[in-house]
Amino acid sequence: MIDTLMVHSVSSSTRNNAQKYSHNSIQGHYHSIFDIVYAADTNQIRWSMTVGTLQDPHGVAARYGEGIILKRPILGIGVVLGREGNYLVISDLHIPYHHRDAFDFLWAVYSYYDCIEILNVGDVIDHHAGSYHESEPDALSSEDEYYQSQKYCKELQSIFPEMTITEGNHDKIPKRKLKSVGLPASMAYDYNQMYGLDKGWKWTERHSFDSKGGQPVLVPMVLNKRGRWDKRVHGQ
């Protein structure tokens, strides 16, 4: 039975998501939200999980929201523990502006929880140079960012050849830019082709699946004083 929905963004309130839907839900997008909320009615108990981010909090692309004290990014990901296997839920990476230890962290969590399937809430790629927000002057050029994104996406695909991704607003920037100049968004319909990737990554607006009674776990990426991952898997 399909019991869980993953989308890039529902709302900024995980509690509202849990109360609103008749199924479990997973989202990303909100970098400063890292929580799980349960809700119940006479028929069932359900949960909603928001999984933070893996974007480098001190990187160029994170500078836009750096001064908002109450919206500091929380580094981490999610795991859904199912009766027949566990699901790794990757948070917003914003390649090539992801944290330098993000891929090592993902592999460690994947191995620790012995995950059978890889899910990704979206914003895999940042597209900073093409953003509708003002770009930082010391950011990569659009050409350099594109080639760096290709490089890191290929590296991530070598780690996780198969992945289901719900498209994020940053992933969609090329489509949005095409529409802005009067061209059809369908010209950028194939993200895998755009970034030279194999077909093992499936991109979709939303993903519904049977978690087999899955329960959510948040796994924070804890940094040491030097800003590097502490090499430990912390579950909560």
Tell where the protein language model's regions lie, with residue ranges.
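Beta-strand-turn-beta hairpins that frame and shape the catalytic cleft
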Residues: 1, 83-88, 209-216
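A short beta-strand-loop-alpha-helix capping motif that often carries His-Thr
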Residues: 1, 171-175, 217-219
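Conserved beta-sheet core of the metallophosphoesterase superfamily
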Residues: 4-79, 212-236
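Short acidic-hydrophobic, aromatic-tinged amphipathic segments that line or gate anion-handling sites
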Residues: 202-205
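Active-site flanking residues adjacent to catalytic metal/cofactor-binding acidic residues
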Residues: 2, 28, 91, 121-123, ...
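Flexible, charged surface loops at secondary-structure boundaries
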Residues: 1, 18-21, 110-114, 157-159, ...
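Core catalytic region of metal-dependent phosphoesterases/phosphodiesterases
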Residues: 90, 95-199
